[in-house]
Amino acid sequence: MKPINVGLLGIGTVGGGTYTVLTRNQEGNRAPCRPPNCHHARRDRNLELARKVTGGQIDVTDDAFAVVVRPRHRHRGRIDRRIHHRARTGYEGDRERQARVAANKALMLAWQRDFRRVAQQKGVIVAFEAAVAGGIPIIKAVAAGAGRQPSSRVLRAIINGTTNFILSEMREKGLAFADVLKEAQPRLCEATRPSTSRAWTAHKLMILAAIGFGIPMQFDKAYVEGISKLDALDIRYAEELGYRQAAWHAPSAPARGVELARAPDPDPRETPDRQCQRRHNAVLVSDACRSHLVYRPDACRRHASAVVADIVDGTRTAYHRRAPAVPHLLSSPTSSWTCRFAIGEVSSAYYLRLRAVDKPGRDGHVTRILATGSLHRCDDSEGNRRQAERRRSGRHHHPDHVTVEKNMDDAIVAIEALPAISGSVTRLRMEELSR
């Protein structure tokens, strides 16, 4: 076998891990990949760091195009997040008939049509296993096995290790969001840019939905909601009700379209994915027979395994001269699925927390508003004692039956207008696998 040469664009966390795995396993598994020729193109262009990681064993340069047009390179790992610069190198690589392995989700969304067109013309692979869920091989699993099945709930994912870490700290230590965020910022890069982290998570969600349902990648159709307004009280109350707070990102397929939501949801503690805590990721796939598969690796590890998996696939394709097993980005122009446009059309049960003063008829007014909107208050028999304690402190929470979100929005506006209610109402969606 003639070895395959690999060029890495970026050698930070992901790129460095990829280099280490390829170099370490070269002799052990006899993989037909030579140690990668590395290009370091991070914003700081820190070539000294690149030389330190590689130990001076490979060529290092700060010119991305020198790696792209190098005839020896059959594979390119693309790690840097500078979108337009990487798009240019992507075009050049496709023209040079190089297989491209990308960990850059924003790049896949922003330039998907152009990359797909050029890649198909040149007959090269565009692989992006590492772009979702921190190294879980979920793209191959969904594309080859569980995707496009007529299930009401196909994919649910915890695909932001930083968010999951913050929620775990809030639950275990009872800290406020701002305190945990400040503690996490020196250690976790995504914690320093919360708004960017939310966008990255929505990118991952959109990729999963596109693969699962064969829809075009429509990032502007994804609903994104952070956890900054979540209080430690909500996490504690969820535990008392038998739920555990998680930042679920769930593309689902009801009859009218595909729902896309990135939002914090209380989830029953007995579900198979509830052991995913701290910086771990998890993806849960439900099939048409209501069975559940959970993919749950350690998100603290490098994405290298996912990048290397794509490189190995590309190597097999090159030697056997067959078409790629995973179609480029998997969006079908003839797909009948559409993204549902408004979050107000989503159906869910809801948890409400509100602060109220002690006035006669207070609970009756709230119940009447919920009943007017065809909403039903659910009493928690096991939590009656705790509810009594919360009534004395002026805090209530009401788990409700399934309803359309726009009805709940109207009810919340009416509840907040009551004289006995102080401040705004906290609302969380409560999801269960049986729905």
From Swiss-Prot:
PANTHER family associated with the record: HOMOSERINE DEHYDROGENASE
Q: Which Pfam families match?
A: Homoserine_dh
User: Could you tell me the superkingdom of the organism this chain comes from?
Assistant: Bacteria
Originating organism: Methylobacillus glycogenes
Protein name from the UniProt record: Homoserine dehydrogenase
Which InterPro entries does this entry report, sorted A to Z?
Answer: HDH_cat, NAD(P)-bd_dom_sf
State which Enzyme Commission number(s) the record gives.
Answer: 1.1.1.3
Name of the encoding gene: hom
Residue positions annotated to bind Na(+) are E129, V132, G134, I136
Keywords on record: Amino-acid biosynthesis, Metal-binding, Methionine biosynthesis, NAD, NADP, Oxidoreductase, Sodium, Threonine biosynthesis
* UniProt entry tagged with the keyword Transport: no
- Residues bound to NADPH are T13, V14, R43, K105
Q: How is the cofactor bound?
A: A sodium ion is seen in the structure; a metal ion may subtly affect the relative position of the nucleotide-binding region to influence enzyme activity, and could increase the stability of the enzyme.
As one GO molecular function, the record gives:
metal ion binding
Q: Which residues lie in Basic and acidic residues bias regions? A: 262-274, 377-391
Residue positions annotated to bind NAD(+) are V14
Outline what the protein does: Catalyzes the conversion of L-aspartate-beta-semialdehyde (L-Asa) to L-homoserine (L-Hse), the third step in the biosynthesis of threonine and methionine from aspartate.
| Catalyzed reactions per annotation | L-homoserine + NADP(+) = L-aspartate 4-semialdehyde + NADPH + H(+); L-homoserine + NAD(+) = L-aspartate 4-semialdehyde + NADH + H(+)
Query: What is the disulfide pattern of this chain?
Result: none
Looking at the record, which segments are called Disordered?
255-274, 377-402
Cofactor(s) the protein needs: a metal cation
Active site residues of this protein: K204 (proton donor)
Gene Ontology biological process terms in this record: methionine biosynthetic process; threonine biosynthetic process
- First-level EC class: oxidoreductase
